[in-house]
Every structure is written in structure tokens, then in C-alpha cells.
């Protein structure tokens, strides 16, 4: 199938500016997607610079392969939660000048009804980031129970009508397996008062199911555990999130590593040990929101938050 999708990276200029790209630096774009950020990073890299991009979506890998003639560029097909493994394999652990994670879905994924992410276009109810692994959304919905579905919608969608929606989905599935996106969207829409929503009523539920079946929060937490081991002292960490669950996870991580650990009063400890404990591993630089102009041009930017931090030099 010919790919006619386009994708405008959110906060692109702000991202490149805060990465502060060095001519011969080493960078990781942990979410290649449609390649907008990677292509822009390559424009700023010198001939001796290196960019390692990661994506689990096979369609993104096909797009990335168009850049394979650029000797500075390396594409890795896999989950960004394995970022430490990839860094070790490429012998760049502790040498990376900047890591970027854009946690938003690409237009390529949303606008292709065959991927099953859209609640306004009909397609198979899939929702897998990598269609070759895991179970599709329709299969999980068929196997799950009311309690689990309710908790997923409540936790990952923050959906106020989770109980009623979960009940109606389970009840419908007992009569007929839900296999299409618009089929699910209609069940959700019929479950709640339309006047309660300014946006599409199925938005939160689709988000919750997608996050759950792709283990998105777990994947993010795993990646965050390793970034400090990968960055060079002074290296930048940029994370672009699009909903509160992601942003809370990122914010919690940055705050945790930007403060020295708690030392109980009266604990027997040497001055050297105390100085070592006082070292903060991360410095929070800023958080950036898209401008009104950008949101007008690119509506998907409205919920974006770019958080920027820098690994401290404690040596």
C-alpha cells in the first residue's frame, strides 16, 4: 500500500534547540515514528556525528530504511524499553549527548484505519504498535472480564463513565464479538451522555485500551531506568508527552533524580560518603508547551508537554 501520510513533529524547533546538537555528537531518537525529528537532527549533525533511532513499528522501519545511505544514521527495530541493550550493543553506553523520546502517536498510525487506532474511521480493532507481536485489541476485549476492563478504563483513560462503558462492552461481546473500531466507538458513545464531552466520547477508552495492550507506561518506566547510564555527563534528556499519565511518569522520574537521596538524622556516615550522596544525577532545565499558533496549525499539539533535563557531571 502506498503511504500518503504526513506528520508534523510537535515542538520541533524547541526540541532541536534544547538538544543543543554537537557537530560530532551521538544522539538517540528513541521513537523514530515518521522520522521528522531524526531527519532534523541529521541536518544539524556533522559528518562524524551519529544518530541511533529506535522504533518497534515495522512501517516506521520501512520509512527509516530510506535514510540507510546516510552513514551517520542507524535504525534499530525494537522497543525503546531496551535502550540500554541497544546502547551496549553499539558501544555507546555513557557516550550519548542527547536522548529524545516523543511519546505521541504518529499521524501515520492514527490516520491508517487498518491499524485500529482511530475511533472515527472504520477498521479492524487492532491497536498494536507492532502488528507482528502481542494480541490485538478485539481479542483482548473478548477474553477480559468486567473488573479488569473497568480498572483499565479508569486507570489508563481516566474515564468517568468507566463502569457503564465496561459493562456495555462486555455485554455486547457476549452476543457478538466486537471486531471493528467504529463498532466499539458506537458502544462507547451510546453508553454516556454526549453533552458531558467536548471531545469525542470514545477518545479516553481507545487511549486506555491502547496503553494497556502495548504496555506503554511500563515501557516508558523501563526506558527511564536506563537513560542516566547511557548519557554522557552534560548530556540532554528530552521527553515529549501527550497525556497526563505519561507526563506524571516523566515528571516523577526527573524530580526523583534531581534531588539528593534522603539521609536519616544520626546515621553514621563519613564526609566523603555524605558528599557522594549529595550529588544530584539530573538537572531539570525546563518544560515547554506549544504556542497558540502551533496548536492552530497542528491541533494534535494541544496536549503536548516537552520536559528537558541534563545529566549532571558529578565526577
From Swiss-Prot:
GO terms for biological process: rRNA base methylation. GO terms for cellular component: cytoplasm. It catalyses: cytidine(1402) in 16S rRNA + S-adenosyl-L-methionine = N(4)-methylcytidine(1402) in 16S rRNA + S-adenosyl-L-homocysteine + H(+). The keyword Phosphoprotein does not apply. Its EC number is 2.1.1.199. It is an enzyme of class 2 (transferase). This is Ribosomal RNA small subunit methyltransferase H. It comes from Buchnera aphidicola subsp. Baizongia pistaciae (strain Bp).
Amino acid at each position: 500500500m502506498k503511504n500518503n501520510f504526513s506528520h508534523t513533529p510537535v515542538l520541533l524547533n524547541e526540541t532541536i534547540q534544547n538538544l543543543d546538537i554537537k557537530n560530532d555528537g551521538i544522539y538517540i531518537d528513541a521513537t523514530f515514528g515518521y522520522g521528522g525529528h531524526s531527519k532534523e537532527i541529521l541536518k544539524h549533525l556533522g559528518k562524524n556525528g551519529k544518530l541511533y533511532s529506535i522504533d518497534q513499528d515495522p512501517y516506521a522501519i520501512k520509512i527509516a530504511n530510506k535514510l540507510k545511505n546516510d552513514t551517520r544514521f542507524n535504525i534499530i527495530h525494537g522497543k525503546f524499553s531496551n535502550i540500554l541493550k541497544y546502547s551496549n550493543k553499539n558501544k555507546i553506553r555513557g557516550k550519548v549527548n542527547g536522548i529524545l523520546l516523543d511519546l505521541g502517536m504518529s499521524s501515520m498510525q492514527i490516520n491508517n484505519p487498518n491499524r485500529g487506532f482511530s475511533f472515527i474511521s472504520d477498521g479492524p480493532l487492532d491497536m498494536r504498535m507492532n502488528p507482528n507481536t502481542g494480541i490485538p485489541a478485539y481479542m483482548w476485549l473478548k477474553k477480559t472480564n468486567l473488573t479488569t476492563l473497568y480498572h483499565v478504563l479508569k486507570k489508563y483513560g481516566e474515564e468517568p463513565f468507566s463502569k457503564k462503558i465496561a459493562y456495555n462492552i462486555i455485554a455486547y461481546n457476549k452476543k457478538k464479538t466486537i471486531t471493528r473500531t467504529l463498532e466499539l466507538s458506537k458502544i462507547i458513545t451510546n453508553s454516556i451522555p454526549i453533552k458531558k464531552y467536548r471531545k469525542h466520547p470514545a477518545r479516553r477508552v481507545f487511549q486506555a485500551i491502547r496503553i494497556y495492550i502495548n504496555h506503554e507506561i511500563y515501557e516508558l518506566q523501563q526506558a527511564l531506568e536506563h537513560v542516566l547510564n547511557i548519557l554522557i555527563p552534560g548530556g540532554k534528556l528530552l521527553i515529549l508527552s501527550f497525556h497526563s499519565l505519561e507526563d506524571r511518569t516523566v515528571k516523577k522520574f526527573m524530580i526523583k533524580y534531581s534531588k539528593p537521596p534522603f539521609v536519616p538524622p544520626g546515621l553514621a556516615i563519613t564526609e566523603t560518603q555524605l558528599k557522594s550522596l549529595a550529588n544530584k544525577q539530573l538537572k531539570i532545565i525546563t518544560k515547554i508547551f506549544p504556542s497558540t499558533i502551533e496548536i492552530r496549525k497542528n491541533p494534535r499539539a494541544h496536549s503536548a508537554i516537552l520536559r528537558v533535563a541534563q545529566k549532571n557531571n558529578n565526577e
